Amino acid sequence: MSGFVVSKPEQSHHRLFDFAKTAIINIFAHPYATVCELYCGGAPETDKWEAAPIGHYIGIDTSSGISSVREAWESQRKNYDVEFFEADPSKDDFEIQLQKKLEQADLVSCWRHLQLCFETEESARRLLTNVACLLKPGGYFFGITPDSSTIWAKYQKNVEAYHNRSGAKPNVFPNYIRSESYMITFELEEEKFPLFGKRYQLKFSGDNASEDHCLVHFPSLIRLAREAGLEFVEIQSLTDFYDDNRAQFASLLMNAGPNFVDPRGKLLPRAFDLLGLYATFIFQKPDPDIEPPLTTPIPFESSNNHDERELPVITVITDASAPAEDPSQGLGKIVEQKGILGPGPADLRFSEAI
């Protein structure tokens, strides 16, 4: 029996996360594509990719995750070729370890581990450099990560409310965020948002264990991606992603479980709260032979401690004369670029770009 037979998750946040992955894969996947999943151990999205149908699947994970996946795969037959490699995308050098796979992937996805790579700048840089090595020119890197703009905004509001209460101690900050659906606890009480290593635990209601994460500082993500040769396309909260694509994905979300949307397909409060905790990110490796590469603005320089309230909007400007994307490549459904640096609440977005 396969170790990753697809079954409908029980918890609401698992079902919503699964819906988001399915929707994003439906947008990007195209026939005969070569797809690479980073940190595929545990539950690779094999059935979602098969519906495309893709032509080749490459799974990469550490030794603890890849062995069980490889064994389980032997009991299944897919309509596309499959390869697994044991490597850590945030530590190992793929130019050395995976020389034969350089510039082979049309798509590279990372669903749950981008935030873990932001423990240090070195690990985040290594991940993005490896992604750039794997992608063909014109290929896309995308996935889902907790929305650090939303998380930090909620935390700041909690701090503000704490200090507005009478009797609050000066220079003391609460270290948690609580909602009906989840609780986030930061390891350190601090007022600033460091670029790397801001650790927290996320525990959903109904779950026994918490998840360890690091906040992803979006300006640093964009900067490191550009240095690795990846151009920023979009970072968008999953609530905005759903609203932009409601006509296409409302029925898919209705099938994911009850009490997520109303009869018109509008998100209900609990689903809005859970989806709003996450964001999707998209980067592209430019193909100079097809069109001029997108211009990614360079985030302004800052100190190592940075309050995300200071983050300006970054607008991505494309060349209007550039040829249109080929919809046969599965990219015609991507909405026009938002140009926002961090998804987060609207009151954290600045009115003008730099």
From Swiss-Prot:
Q: What Pfam families is this protein classified in?
A: mRNA_G-N7_MeTrfase
Q: Which InterPro entries match?
A: mRNA_G-N7_MeTrfase_dom (IPR004971), RG7MT1 (IPR039753), SAM-dependent_MTases_sf (IPR029063)
The Enzyme Commission number assigned here is 2.1.1.56
| Catalysed conversion reaction | a 5'-end (5'-triphosphoguanosine)-ribonucleoside in mRNA + S-adenosyl-L-methionine = a 5'-end (N(7)-methyl 5'-triphosphoguanosine)-ribonucleoside in mRNA + S-adenosyl-L-homocysteine
Q: Which GO terms describe its cellular component?
A: nucleus
Chain sites annotated for binding S-adenosyl-L-methionine: K21, D61, D88, P89
* UniProt entry keywords in alphabetical sequence: Methyltransferase, mRNA capping, mRNA processing, Nucleus, RNA-binding, S-adenosyl-L-methionine, Transferase
Q: Which PROSITE patterns does the entry link to?
A: RNA_CAP0_MT (PS51562)
Q: Which residues form the mRNA cap 0 methyltransferase domain?
A: 8-286
- Nucleus among the record's keywords? yes
- What is the recorded function of this protein according to its Swiss-Prot or TrEMBL entry? mRNA capping methyltransferase that methylates the N7 position of the added guanosine to the 5'-cap structure of mRNAs. Binds RNA containing 5'-terminal GpppC.
The name of this protein is: mRNA cap guanine-N(7) methyltransferase 2
The species this protein was found in? Arabidopsis thaliana
